[in-house]
Amino acid sequence: MDANAILQVVLFCAIILGLTPLLGGYMARVFSGERVLLSVVFGPLERGLYRLSGVRPKEEQHWAAYALSMLVFNLAGLLGLYLILRVQGWLPLNPAGLGAVAPDLAFNTAVSFVTNTNWQAYGGESTLSYFSQMVGLTVQNFVSAATGIAVLVALIRGFARRSARTLGNFWVDLTRTVLYLLLPLAFVTALVLVWQGAPQTLGDYVQAAPLEGGSQVIALGPVASQEAIKQLGSNGGGFFSVNSAHPFENPTPLSNLIEMVLLLAVAAGLTNTFGRMVGDTRQGWALFAAMSLMFVVGLGVTLWQESAANPAMVVAGIEAGGGNMEGKEVRLGVANSAIWAVATTAASNGSVNAMHDSFMPLAGMVPMINMMLGEVIFGGVGAGLYGMLIFVMVTVFIAGLMVGRTPEYLGKKIEAREMKLAVISLLVPPLCILGFGAVALTWPQAAASVQDPGPHGLTEALYAYVSGTANNGSAFAGFAANVFPHNLMIGLAMLIGRFLVILPVLAIAGSLGAKKIVPVSAGTFPTHGGLFIGLLVGVIVVVGGLTYFPVLALGPILEQLMLRSGSLF
């Protein structure tokens, strides 16, 4: 790893650190109902939307009503997107004349975008029309991200309020997230991407004459607008099959830096929002520090592995002074590819600017571990922080047991009900990953979709189900996902991995909101210092990581050992 790579890492981390309090403070004002600068522009539109839809913005909801509103809204989005994909051939803005999407793929895709996963078992430019991309996918990119943030805000209110029966209004939180946060930032980002060279057009595909003769069809479309919210909302689904490795999605070094920053900006800012809304910014910075520590360690391992040559190439006498460049854009290099890979899986985004399948075994394991930990290292917008707060409750529970006190966090007692719900949310991901993956691979058609033998083939299949369950969406590209068993099983894993985690979180929020705040005493465990940060990271690694150690030992760890010994498969 050279000085240039170190400089890129430092610059990226410095930008995220600088944006965290700025975005965090702004979002705290938005979700507290305060007027902000954009209220002049969006205030009348917000009030008009409430009147049109019959929403009473001052009327708050019990956690169960909040959850029901969230489920109904997402079910409507799922059915609407599925219908768009199935009748695509009859809809406008389809210059390539693409037909209807197959039922199983349409189900998988609809679930993917509604759950903020953006798993893509298809090639965007060869499967979906402009209408499907804009009205179907891009709309869900906004509202699925807003759903995650709304759930987080409800949980924060549960910690901040005392003896309260309500958590806010889902429809208000959803609307304010889209209008005051996602839409303005996405609009500005889209303009910057157009300036940098990303297409934004409804015109036909272009016929080109390459130098080697013949003809070539160059796909275009409204790329910049989808790219902006794809990065900002931790969505990740690319307009093109190769995602942000495509020069139309990611044209320049500046666009690459902007898109990398967007991967973590909102998720990092929400830690500061949390601290402000509970009345103690130190709590937010403690969570930010824990996330940053795990992020930097993972990034260090990835850069170390990718900066060195592949041992198999060294044995063969092939010069690889630039590191492991397989599957990477030469214009971006190892450092940018490594930062993006770690950030996109830390952030539940899933977009890529390099092929994770071509990473060295241990480097490819880092993104997978980021997802296996529940994507709490910043995580998806909203989803990452409420996942982290589940681990926080487990941590203070363990700390309370060690000193013989009832666990507390922010003055709220963490009792049996909260712990049972927390354990449910922690058990859902491994059950989906290992269970659905094992069941799917009993089908010969599904097993045949794994294109590589040996431990790497196991890693490809495992990565797919980890990515789907964790609502990430990235993939090891040697895995042929568009077959019925995987479309069905990954679709179910995405649904369960999203909503069977959200529901316990909202139940916890309701339970905490109804409690009184216990005064701080001499025996209260401080949750803003280095001891707590270290204990929290330890709990995440032990509880989240050791669950998967056996299958990791059979996959990337075994592959690394074989590679170092000179054994190929």
Curated annotation (Swiss-Prot):
InterPro entries: KdpA. It is a multi-pass membrane protein. Keywords: Cell inner membrane, Cell membrane, Ion transport, Membrane, Potassium, Potassium transport, Transmembrane, Transmembrane helix, Transport. It comes from the Bacteria. The chain crosses the membrane at residues 5-25, 65-85, 87-107, 136-156, 178-198, 254-274, 284-304, 383-403, 421-441, 461-481, 488-508, 531-551. GO terms for cellular component: plasma membrane. Its main location: membrane. It is found in: Cell inner membrane. One of its GO terms (molecular function) is P-type potassium transmembrane transporter activity. Belongs to the KdpA family. The system is composed of three essential subunits: KdpA, KdpB and KdpC. Part of the high-affinity ATP-driven potassium transport (or Kdp) system, which catalyzes the hydrolysis of ATP coupled with the electrogenic transport of potassium into the cytoplasm. This subunit binds the periplasmic potassium ions and delivers the ions to the membrane domain of KdpB through an intramembrane tunnel. This is Potassium-transporting ATPase potassium-binding subunit. The lineage of its organism: Bacteria, Pseudomonadati, Pseudomonadota, Alphaproteobacteria, Rhodospirillales. The gene is kdpA.
